[in-house]
Amino acid sequence: MAMAKNVVVIGAQWGDEGKGKIVDWLAEEAGGVVRFQGGHNAGHTLVVGGKKTILRLIPSGILHEGLDCFIGSGVVVSPEALLGEIDELNAAGVKNVEGRLKIAPTCPLILPYHIALDQAREASRGKGKIGTTGRGIGPAYEDKVARRAIRAADLLHPEKLREKLDAVLAYYNVQLQYLHNAGPVKAEDVMAVIEKVAPRIAPMIADVSRVLNEKNKNGEKLLFEGAQGALLDIDYGTYPFVTSSNCLAGAASAGAGVGPQMLDYVLGIVKAYTTRVGSGPFPTELFDEVGAGLAERGHEFGSVTGRARRCGWFDAAALKRSIQINGISGMCITKLDVMDGVETINICVGYELPGGGKTDILPCGSDAVETCKPIYETMPGWRESTVGVKSYDALPANAKAYLKRIEEVCGAPVAIVSTGPDREETIVLHHPFA
């Protein structure tokens, strides 16, 4: 049987682009949905039939009855957050969540000492805060790279786990007590958490890499669900105001345990304007009533943290960088309806640099981006409502012109347009699985 076509969905901006809705929509055709990086530091919001669900760790395909979902080894897993999410889904009537969810044995676990250090560090930074969610993501990735992580497979061997834990806590408690003036974390408290979660987590641990490769050989389509956004990538984002993982399409290969030849189509999710949460440079940020209007109409508050998002004009130069580093096959433009009624629209097509130079692509690193002054093209907006429009031809002429100009400046085609939060409020120009 021929190998199935597989799709990677990534955020192409600074996160919060609307990936959850699109993954949920694409999951109709998938045989499996896979998370491959990040942790429970970002929420994916899904609206089905007017009912809202926020997922943080579990793939957005879980609402589809009978669909298998996977958490690959690139994800750092908080057992308590995971079980809390499962309990929420069970209470909402979602069937057989634990039976359909598989976790790679190689996933690093987020435990109480990660959270303690994450929060103590951020408190110590004062004005230099990075904007971490304080959920232990960064310290858990540090442990992975430093080869001291306690991983999902360790839950199957509690006698060996205690030895590892004692060694890890010796390292953590020195930092907590002497660098951050915080209290130590007790091994007994961590073991109490582990003993509570292990019986439920253990049955979900499986060789995710093998299962995914078998599914692909059997002709099942796979959907890889990214978290955060490409401009928050640890290597290519506005460092150090970034997340702790690789958020790019290429990370799906390593983070899920599949070969790169299995990644057939990369769908970049792109908001019709730009937002950013927390600290870091943002060249097109708006500080006027237009920005406030976008925030209000777009409900721009983090689904996990509740933090207000900063809003700005569409940044095509930043998106160019994202298209380049991800190999984006097509774009899904979300929240087009939020732009309804904006009289004049600006698109950033490049930046003026110190010394008189210009560039048409976002530089790497926050120091370089801080110095960028946006170069704008102006377009007329539209007064008509695009809310819930399901046909491209039914869009206002100026909305279509806006989408066309985004394609021209960025160099990638628009495949999908989202005109509302519900699964059905979607215009399809090219189906990624086609």
Curated annotation (Swiss-Prot):
Pathway(s) served: Purine metabolism; AMP biosynthesis via de novo pathway; AMP from IMP: step 1/2
Cofactor binding note from Swiss-Prot or TrEMBL: Binds 1 Mg(2+) ion per subunit.
Listed InterPro entries: Adenylosuccin_syn_GTP-bd, Adenylosuccin_syn_Lys_AS, Adenylosuccinate_synth_dom1, Adenylosuccinate_synth_dom2, Adenylosuccinate_synth_dom3, Adenylosuccinate_synthetase, P-loop_NTPase
Source domain of life: Bacteria
GO BP, sorted A to Z: 'de novo' AMP biosynthetic process; IMP metabolic process
Localization: Cytoplasm
Active site location: D16 (proton acceptor), H44 (proton donor)
GO terms, molecular function: adenylosuccinate synthase activity; GTP binding; magnesium ion binding
Name of the molecule in the record: Adenylosuccinate synthetase
Species for this entry: Neisseria gonorrhoeae (strain NCCP11945)
Encoding gene per record: purA
